């Protein structure tokens, strides 16, 4: 997929804020500070998604219109302890409504920090998506920060951890070096063309 144009068209804080569904869309979810915005900017080859060093900055569902026909959707991060319980529940309801009611959703990309073992919150997200029959692909982020001598071991550890849920594609990426970006775009292109 070649991304020719991208525009942030909607910042949704309630389900009523969602734009009408298009032919297809993909969503990106992960723990706070996993690198969602940086990965989106790498996919877009443009700095459009706000990047912050402070966890929990994405507090809405952000819809990016790509090539005037598809949505790339940035979901709020999970697992950030300093956010109030009330706000976490609001995010959970917002994301749950999105998962249940967006018929145009083709795939969720679950972003996991490749430097560390998957966290309990990552497993909870997988179980939640599986319970809702949401298709997903696992994307390891920040792989540029993993020493070359440790990469094979880290990938193997992640594959072993996630294998309890079945066989899933795992794509190692880096928004800094561009690793995995074209592979991810190719997968997205295939998904959106099929539907």
Swiss-Prot record:
Membrane-spanning ranges: none
Cofactor(s) for this UniProt protein: Mg(2+)
Binding site for GTP: 30-37, 56-60, 74-77, 141-144, 173-175
Molecular-function annotations in GO: GTP binding; metal ion binding
Keywords tagged on the record: Cell cycle, Cell division, GTP-binding, Magnesium, Metal-binding, Nucleotide-binding, Septation
GO BP annotation list: division septum assembly
Binding site for Mg(2+): 37, 58
Ranges for domain EngB-type G: 22-194
Database matches in InterPro entries: G_ENGB_dom (IPR030393), GTP-bd (IPR006073), GTP-bd_ribosome_bio_YsxC (IPR019987), P-loop_NTPase (IPR027417), Small_GTP-bd (IPR005225)
Keyword match Secreted: no
One Pfam family, short name: MMR_HSR1
Gene Ontology CC annotations of this record: cytosol
S-S bonds: none
Record family assignment: Belongs to the TRAFAC class TrmE-Era-EngA-EngB-Septin-like GTPase superfamily. EngB GTPase family.
Protein role: Necessary for normal cell division and for the maintenance of normal septation.
Name of the protein this chain belongs to: Probable GTP-binding protein EngB
Organism: Thermotoga petrophila (strain ATCC BAA-488 / DSM 13995 / JCM 10881 / RKU-1)
Upper lineage: Bacteria, Thermotogati, Thermotogota, Thermotogae, Thermotogales
């Amino acid at each position: 997929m070649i991304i020719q144009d991208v525009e942030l068209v909607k910042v949704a804080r309630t389900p009523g804020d969602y734009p009408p569904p298009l032919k297809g869309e993909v969503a990106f979810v992960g723990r706070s500070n996993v690198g969602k915005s940086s990965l989106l900017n790498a996919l877009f080859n443009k700095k459009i998604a706000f990047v912050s060093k402070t966890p929990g900055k994405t507090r809405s569902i952000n819809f990016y219109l790509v090539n005037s026909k598809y949505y790339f959707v940035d979901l709020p991060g999970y697992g950030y302890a300093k956010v109030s319980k009330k706000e976490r529940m609001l995010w959970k309801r917002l994301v749950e409504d999105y998962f249940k009611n967006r018929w145009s959703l083709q795939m969720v990309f679950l972003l996991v920090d490749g430097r560390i073992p998957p966290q309990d919150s990552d497993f909870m997200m997988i179980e939640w998506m599986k319970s809702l029959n949401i298709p997903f692909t696992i994307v390891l982020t920040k792989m540029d920060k993993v020493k070359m001598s440790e990469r094979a071991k880290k990938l193997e550890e992640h594959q072993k951890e996630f294998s309890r849920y079945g066989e899933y594609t795992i794509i190692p990426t880096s928004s800094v070096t561009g690793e995995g970006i074209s592979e991810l775009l190719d997968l997205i292109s295939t998904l959106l063309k099929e539907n």
